[in-house]
Amino acid sequence: MSVAEPAPRRRRRRGWIIALAVLVVVLVVAVVVGESAARAYATGRIHDELATAFGLDADHPMDVDLGPGLLLAQAATGTIDSVDVAIDDVPLGDLTGTVDLEATGIPLDAERAVGTVRATATVDEKNVAKLGGYLSGVDLDSITLGDGTIDVAATVKALFLSVPVSAAIVPTAEDGQLVFTPRSVTVNGQVVDVADLTSGPLGSLASKFLGSQSFCVAQYLPSAVELDSVQVRRADLVLVFAGDDVVLGGPALSTKGTCPS
């Protein structure tokens, strides 16, 4: 009497299928664990480097986003696609703001340059008020943010009279500095041409009130990035910085910038 053996073959086939399924699960878990470990390491490294670059405490909170793609797959090519970092309460001299940093094409080789680096610092109206000494040569009654301008107001003494004056000041970026230039002036409710006011009989007083001054932002930031533009947007002063050929292993991230003397 013969005995058929199909059942053991099915069991062996089923065993191979189970083994392959287990192997796939193990590989997936390994990738997930490896990906998580890689992201944790990269996030910590980025945090530490930026804390040093911006002069922050070692435990200063940051939101680091390494993008949606597999970090391990990107690392295999030698370049990370993109990194976005948000940092609150970054000191910029007299100012404090929120910095949003964007970098693309970040090489794993620290001797190679990053593709692009762009940072945006957002400073609210309360902090802008700390720039009073750079906006005018007299004590100011108020500092507010207007339609693309920083609006200042003061009361000045002229011929034994107290005269209310105000000015709309336009901030611009120049050689790593915030430069403040008056666009319009109102004296006792009347709009006066800036040139006429400074060249008139009250010229010396007007010049003191309107004197264009500058605030060096570069000295508080890594020399790798430069102040590119500035604008007043709603209730914030927005500073945009950009960096070209930034080498992660070079001194440009550990040294501060400078402004013309």
Residue ranges and their predicted role:
Residues M1-L70, Q74-A76, A252-S261:
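Hydrophobic membrane-targeting and insertion signals
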Residues D59-L159, S166:
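N-terminal beta-strand/beta-hairpin edge segment
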Residues I143, I169-P171, S229-V230:
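A structural signal for short hydrophobic beta-strand segments in well-ordered beta-sheet cores
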Residues I150, G176-L178, L237:
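Hydrophobic residues embedded in beta-strands of well-ordered beta-sheets
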Residues T155-A158, P182-V191, V240-G250:
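Secondary-structure transition/turn motif
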Residues A167-P201:
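Short helix-loop boundary/capping segments
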Residues L197-S261:
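Extracytoplasmic/luminal low-complexity segments enriched in Pro/Gly and acidic/polar residues
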